[in-house]
Amino acid sequence: MSCPIMEPIPPMAPVLLSACLKEAGFSSIGKDLNIDFFNHFKDSGHWGDIHNLFAIGHVTKISLPRRVIIDILKFIKQYLLEVKKQYDPEYIGLSIFTSESVDFSILVMSYIKKYLPEVKIVLGGRGLENHHGLTDMKHYEMYNKFGMADLIVVGDAETSLIDALTDDATGIY
């Protein structure tokens, strides 16, 4: 599942990795949360502020009306519950394509843990390899330290993800 990068561009990683997993005998589907989120909120009248909040929110103070924040959280919850209903996944993988995806991914991970506690969270993507602005850690190190994901695949994942899932690996792989 792609985490929003706040641009209406379909990311390739979820579809590519889904195909690799299928080839290796896993059941998998690529979901584009990025496009679904964009389509849901683009005409809300608040898209500019929503975009800025998640794209540069950790740098700049952006203020959104409470109702918009509630709508974003409801969207994430409904999206995840629909994924659960349709696919009943054992894992949900999040593609953190750029550092713009990082803030949104934290919301998604917290909602997976809250509403789908039996589903394991797998993270990957180049956005995880950037340094967190407030620490010396890279994002994937921070996520691992605080137990935000069950498995974090660093680097190209076409084969390492398959190996990690086959080995039932946890932590940084």
Give the location of each predicted region.
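Flexible, glycine-rich phosphate/dinucleotide-binding loops
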Residues: 7, 37-39, 130
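N-terminal beta-loop-helix "entrance" segment that forms/cooperates
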Residues: 37-50
